[in-house]
Design a protein with these regions (language model features):
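A generic alpha-helix signature
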Residues: 1-5, 9, 34, 58
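Basic/polar phosphate-binding segments, predominantly the helix-turn-helix DNA-binding elements
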Residues: 26-54, 77-102
């Protein structure tokens, strides 16, 4: 398997499985039958981004689409692969600079009910 091909397969696998909360370097290591340190180092060499950061970015792209719909934050967090609402809120703010509710307000939708101060 060529290196470029393995990278593309990893990207495709992440995109297809972003909603799985257990998706991480160990899951990719197991799926592609490669040691976790290799998977982590190889992905960063090919993409320029840490694997965990890349998974977060893929998930957040899906989150941003869902925020423009009427889904509750708790539902979005679970369906986009975050293990908890708390981690979802922390990661979203870390990457986007605003809370999910603020993002929604800036982009035209308002959250019905949620507590972001968890």
């Amino acid at each position: 398997m060529k290196k470029g091909r393995l990278y593309l397969e990893m990207r495709d696998y992440i995109e297809a499985n972003y909603s799985d909360a257990t998706l991480n370097v160990n899951a990719l290591s197991e799926h592609f039958e490669r040691p976790a340190p290799f998977v982590s180092r190889y992905f960063k060499e090919m993409n320029g981004t840490n694997l965990t950061q890349y998974i977060h970015k893929v998930r957040l792209e899906h989150v941003k689409e869902k925020l423009l719909q009427d889904e509750k934050l708790e539902t979005i967090a679970v369906t986009c692969g975050f293990g908890s609402l708390r981690s979802f809120l922390r990661i979203f703010k870390q990457y986007e600079g605003v809370t999910p509710t603020q993002y929604r307000e800036l982009h035209g939708k308002k959250e019905e009910t949620t507590n972001e101060n968890i």
